[in-house]
Structure formats: C-alpha cells, structure tokens
Curated annotation (Swiss-Prot):
Its EC number is 7.2.2.20. Keywords: ATP-binding, Cell inner membrane, Cell membrane, Ion transport, Membrane, Nucleotide-binding, Translocase, Transport, Zinc, Zinc transport. This is Zinc import ATP-binding protein ZnuC. Residues 6-221 form the ABC transporter domain. It is found in: Cell inner membrane. GO terms for molecular function: ABC-type zinc transporter activity; ATP binding; ATP hydrolysis activity. It comes from the Bacteria.
Amino acid sequence: MNTPVIAAEGLSIRVDGRTVLADISVAVAAGEIVTIVGPNGSGKSTFLRALIGALPAASGRVIRAPGLRIGYVPQKLAIDATLPITVSRFLSLPRRVPQDVAAEALARAGVPDLANRQMTDLSGGQFQRVLLARAVLERPHLLLLDEATQGLDQPGSAAFYEQIEEVRQDLGCAVVMVSHDLHVVMAASDRVLCMNGHICCEGTPEVVADAPEYRALFGTGTRGALALYRHQHSHRHDDDCGHDHGAEHMHPHGDR
C-alpha cells in the first residue's frame, strides 16, 4: 500500500455522552477510493467529521499527513431561496477565489458553464457538482464525501461517481465517501468499510458482499447483493442531457 494520507488509530468518538464510534483503526492511501456503508446511526458521518477535525476523539487519534489538504462535500447544505447568490459568488465564500481557479474547479466537477447561474435554480445533480467544485478548489490530497448522491436517481448517481473517479485520476487524491445505499457502492472503490459503531468488515466490494458480518447486519438474503454503480452511457447526464437527476509521519500525495 502507498503511504497513507490519513489514518485513524483506535479512534473512539462520544457524542452527548454516548459512544458513537469505538476502536476504529483504518488508513487511507494516496489515490485510494474507500466507500463506507452501514445503517442509519452507524457513525459513518461522525467518522468523516472526526477525520476533518470537527469532532474530538474520546480515545485514540487521527493522524494527518503534514500539509494535508482536505476537500469536503457535506451531506446537506441549505441555501436560502430568497438569497440571490450565483455559483461564482458561492465558490468565493468566505474568501475570494480567482476567476480562473473557480473555472478550473467547475470544469473538474463537470459543470463548466454554471458560473453565472443562481444557486437556487440548480437541479439536484448540478447542486452536488457545484459542491464538488468547491471541495476541489485547492486541489486536495484527500476528498471526503458524505452521502453526496442522496436524492439523485441511479443515472445521476452513476454520472456523479464517474466524475469522482475522473477527479481522483486528475488530482491523484484519495477519496473517502459515505454511501446512503447499503447495497450499492461506486464500481471504482478499492475498498469498502462496513460500519456499525465499529468496523464490521472491510475489503474489496466482492469480499464485503460475501462477508458473514455484512450478511448478519443486513440480512441473510443479502449475500452477494453489494452492487456496483457503473456508468453505462456514453452521454453526460444532468446538464448536458437537460434532465434533472436529483430532487506519525506521512506524506501527502503530490498534485498532478
């Protein structure tokens, strides 16, 4: 495995006096795509928040590579419908972003023509891609996505996942994403973590799909049911087709 960009060692997190995560140990390598699945309340989003330093560890630790740049796509982001704000202006909050940098990020997210659109006029898929553009503004070494395809239909989700893979290839960044669907993960995932307050099992999608721990958690009928999102079409979704598909020492991987 390549040198990790981030790692959790014996990490436990408590929220409101309750242990949400217990003894999590996992390392993410440069360029690796890791997908996290698990039931609601299993600690998936909490784990991402701990990785970015938004939650303190009750025990254990998170080790980040020196100079690590992290891009984060949140689970939800509410925009006041009465607040006029263009995509370009949104990307410049809280500090101004040069126009060429914003244009590069939008192109990398697959929506190069949205700069002057109002945020409130975007479709679900367009909105998620703008959030992705914001996350890659500073060319991160690590990209974290919290249920980023929630609310998108299958074609929209598949197209978004394809864009994530392109970002990974372009930037050489590691990707850690939480999947809202227990049984569907991105086809390009190098590793899947099945989480329920702890790591139940991990491995390639094929290994996890057959793991007894996975079947015990989600039912005996789920054996081999961990499906993969693959983009099956040559055309682009959302914008191009006009449809709305959505209601102690580590070194970061260098930019490409």
